[in-house]
């Protein structure tokens, strides 16, 4: 079966984010979800938040909290947002951090500590993936995210969510990160 690549689709009239997510990324996401079972999502920048464009929550029996397209997460309060900030162009990153630092939303306030944020982004780039832990009553939810790049252009973040009691973080990094990277590369080709 043949599929158009991101770069080829970008040449067509009327191409938009929704088209590439549904036509190019979704089959790869489903394949990855079938393999790893945990929910997978693609998020893009939308204003001052990350917008979930596509998820496999409805296909994953392990998705405790179902999130669908249109769900928004904070840039500095999510693995997808941290991955996006890490790999976006410096000018865009600086503008986003300035915007977030002025925000009234609690989840954006950490942007005011630019040194701390820059240290986080440097560590994320060094590791090659973003990580985020969200406390929950029963078990923390961990998220790991990698960038989806078309050449040098950042398109989105590819993220997996899982329970910290079911999969310890070190094991998740070993098992999930290589598969996330491979899938992100296939989507971006």
Question: Language-model features: where?
Answer:
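Amphipathic alpha-helical effector-binding/dimerization core
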Residues: 3-99
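A short, flexible beta-alpha/helix-coil linker loop
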Residues: 8-11, 102-103, 163-167
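Short, basic/aromatic recognition patches
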Residues: 25-32, 97-145, 189
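Generic structural signal for secondary-structure transition and capping sites
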Residues: 37, 93, 126-130, 185
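Short glycine-aspartate micro-motif
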Residues: 41, 143-145, 157
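Short clusters of small/polar residues that mark proteolytic maturation junctions
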Residues: 55-57, 135, 159-160
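Juxtadomain coupling helices with adjacent low-complexity linkers
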Residues: 127, 138-140, 155-189
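Sensor-regulatory modules in signal-transduction proteins
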Residues: 148-151
